[in-house]
Amino acid sequence: MDILIISLKSLGYSRTHKSLDSGPLVVHAVAGAGKSTALRKLILRHPTFTVHTLGVPDKVSIRTRGIQKPGPIPEGNFAILDEYTLDNTTRNSYQALFADPYQAPEFSLEPHFYLETSFRVPRKVADLIAGCGFDFETNSQEEGHLEITGIFKGPLLGKVIAIDEESETTLSKHGVEFVKPCQVTGLEFKVVTVVSAAPIEEIGQSTAFYNAITRSKGLTYVRAGT
């Protein structure tokens, strides 16, 4: 565990007051904070670590084991579970739990370490996320492209993500192909359009909105309200 804690501190994670003797090590980080990248480097440098995820696993590689689906843990290895908040029945076999609690807050635990800074999310999008009530900031130098209009006052471009049932119904009636936020967890797209039946000022601290808008790594469009 010492290697992991040293790594977290070097990456800028902040320590809470929770005792390290209380259960598995819990680590929280916002979208784009480099959590998965840090875990990949950890298992590449230290073969005694095993990392599983309840999200999207890495593709098979000849260079490294990568982040895998939950399965057997080699005897003596330090086991880490990423995206632990997606299920509360799988975590007992692991010594450390990682997640972005904003993606599934109902199953989140009190953390030992946390990181509120993204390195991927553009400034305009980060400001919008923070304005919706999330503790979120970014170190990205990209201003980014963010456009906010009513649902039918702008084109629906790229990956269209509907964040509520009313917007799903509206898009279906017009024959628009879309996905739900839960279908794109851990994925990123160059162009994303987030569709909400409620206007942007009424969305608030919505898990669905957070999951949707943080999938964009390029052009971001929000079609909210009428």
UniProtKB/Swiss-Prot annotation:
Mention any one GO cellular component term assigned to this protein in its UniProt record.
cytoplasmic viral factory
Q: Which Gene Ontology BP annotations are present?
A: symbiont-mediated suppression of host innate immune response; transport of virus in host, cell to cell
User: According to its UniProt record, where is this protein mainly located?
Assistant: host cell
All copies of domain (+)RNA virus helicase ATP-binding, residue ranges: 1-115
Intracellular or extracellular location(s): Host cytoplasm
Q: Which UniProt keywords apply?
A: Host cytoplasm, Host-virus interaction, Inhibition of host innate immune response by virus, RNA-binding, Suppressor of RNA silencing, Transport, Viral immunoevasion, Viral movement protein
Entries under Pfam families matching the protein: Viral_helicase1
Keyword DNA repair in record: no
Q: Which PROSITE patterns match?
A: PSRV_HELICASE (PS51657)
(+)RNA virus helicase C-terminal domain mapped to chain residues: 116-226
Output one GO MF annotation.
RNA binding
**InterPro entries (alphabetical):** (+)RNA_virus_helicase_core_dom
Q: What else is known?
A: TGBp1, TGBp2 and TGBp3 seem to act together for cell-to-cell propagation. TGBp1 is the main movement protein that physically cross the plasmodesma with the viral genome. TGBp2 and TGBp3 would facilitate TGBp1 function.
The family classification in the record reads: Belongs to the Tymovirales TGBp1 protein family.
- Subunit (UniProt): Homodimer and homooligomer. Interacts with capsid protein. Interacts with host AGO1; this interaction targets the host protein for degradation, thereby suppressing the antiviral RNA silencing.
Q: What does this protein do?
A: Transports viral genome to neighboring plant cells directly through plasmosdesmata, without any budding. The movement protein allows efficient cell to cell propagation, by bypassing the host cell wall barrier. Increases plasmodesma size exclusion limit. Acts as a suppressor of RNA-mediated gene silencing, also known as post-transcriptional gene silencing (PTGS), a mechanism of plant viral defense that limits the accumulation of viral RNAs.
Protein's name according to its UniProt entry: Movement and silencing protein TGBp1
